[in-house]
Amino acid sequence: ALYTELFDQRVDVEGTLLKPNMVLSGYEASDRAGVDEVAAATVHTLTKHVPAAVPGIVFLSGGQSDEDATAHLNAMNARGPHPWQLSFSYGRALQAPALKAWEGKPENVEAGQRAYYHRAKMNSAARSGLYAPEMEREAVAV
């Protein structure tokens, strides 16, 4: 319905980005979808409803943990190629680790910066389908 209306209104979708959530289990679901299931359901939905002319889809983290959001993005990109670029537009999933490390204290600024850089680096790898959970532990060991 969205893209039908955009086409009817003569919107050039080649100049747009879609910013959705991923297909996730409900908050109260006892049976949680795994990483591959989330990736498959999300890509399937996008394939059915988003025209190939849309250049990119940038995901919200939608309340996921930092690492889950990264793992899901990675799994989607690993299933590619896709007609659109799949990337991230995370707020909390990028900022929360940095804010936790910083704690509002001047002496923790560098720790907050390192935490932010680490999350951005993990998501950059996921954007290319190159993320692995082991990368999280390697960074902690440094």
Regions found by a protein language model. Give the residues of each.
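Active-site capping/gating regions of soluble enzymes
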Residues: 1-142
